[in-house]
Amino acid sequence: MIIGGYMDIEIRNKIDRIWEYFWTGGITNPLSVIEQITYLLFIKALDDVELRNEKDDVFLGITSSRIFDKEHQNCRWSVFKDYEAGKMYKNMQENVFPFIKSLGNSKKSSYSKYMQDAIFMIPTPLMLQKVVTGINGIPMKDRDTKGDVYEYLLSKLSTAGTNGQFRTPRHIIRMMVELMKPTPQDIIVDPACGSAGFMVEAGEYLRKNHKEMFNNPREIEHFNNTMFYGFDIDTTMLRISAMNLIQHGIENPNIEYKNAIGEENEDKNKFTLVLANPPFKGSVDLETIAKDLRTTTNKSKKTELLFLALFLKILKTGGRTASIVPDGVLFGSSNQHKAIRKEIIENHNLEAIISMPSGVFKPYAGVSTAIMIFTKTGQGGTDKVWFYDMTADGFSLDDQRQPVKENDIPDIIERFNNRDSKEEQNRARTEKSFFVPKEEIVENDYDLSINKYKEIVIEKKEYEHPKVILKRVMDMEEEIQSILKELGDIL
């Protein structure tokens, strides 16, 4: 992966050059740049599939169905990439773009349904030619490289300020996935999926830790078609997330335009794993919220509370959640805050609260957050809750976010995985991690903030006797007077 990893500097430079073409051409919104590049990557990917099918047909002596019919051969990347600028631009406007938008009604591409309202924004023939040539010069033969290229593009959203909210830092996503350990049987959902970072990382985890599933036709079918679900209300992000998943080798992800907390969302008892960083932007219109979510949260309008209720609704019994929440969810004193905490603690199994430092989402947000991990049971199960006080994530906690040695993430994963051990069970509350019994949490109005339970040890410091300190000060004063006298004699 790119975030936290390395990438061929030559490929990185080529992507930066393409980015600069957009910038100097007047398209400076990072989201718009990525969207336009996404369209072109999709067009290229279609032709790559067609070329592969043609080779297979020759080898097998058959004729399979085609993406491009005879009338649309000029829509193929391999055909128009060498056109002169004016001809390429006219062909893109009049033929290629209308063609890929028309694919939305077919099943020729899992991504095509997100193309129907796509807008071609590249303003000049010369700019289009430069971008096409630039993309054509990036070697994207295998899944890893395709994924890395798209990850690097998306990383530019992180440094873009206003659009940064779409991305959870990659290393935080990876930590959450490793804590939850997705299995080949899981049905994974992110109800506010943004650029699909959680699903991508879950897919990568399965490739690394469950290689055997990719030799099983049934599990491959599940991985490509029925494992990954993502919802969002931003069509641009739907296109970007779909392409991100496809570039990472997930052929047909279920990415849908859906207000997850709205009445129209009929999903219930469907998924086995929620991985999410839902929006915590404030209030939404009560009338648009699903009635059962209103009931669970005591008529809350706050998205951060409504999404927690949503997770309980859409999970199957035994399904698990790892979600980022703002600190206010943990200690908020309103009836609505208490209602959702009580629901999770009393009727399900709250397993862990990982408190994160406020700098994790810098430079674009300084809010303090935590990770909540719980299992839907419908019949309680919370005995005691594991807390961890994370103070370092491997990067400086200022706006620069430079790599540093201090990093609690490996320790968090190790301790969480071994929380049944005697050592972990018996840790003092002065340590990084510790358990708090349910009864104590209930007594504290279901408060889940770590500072409510963490004990601070104040080290006793020994000071010298005042007479000794006074003697030292007087000696210093005597020395100063002596130096001043010497200076006076010289002058």
Residue ranges and their predicted role:
Residues 33, 37, 233-240, 255, ...:
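Conserved Class I SAM-dependent methyltransferase catalytic core
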Residues 1-184, 253-265, 355-359, 382-396, ...:
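Non-catalytic, mostly N-terminal accessory regions of nucleic-acid modification and defense proteins
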Residues 226, 258, 290-296, 356-357, ...:
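Short beta-alpha connecting loops at secondary-structure transitions
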Residues 47, 195, 235-236, 262, ...:
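Conserved nucleotide-binding/hydrolysis micro-motifs of P-loop NTPases
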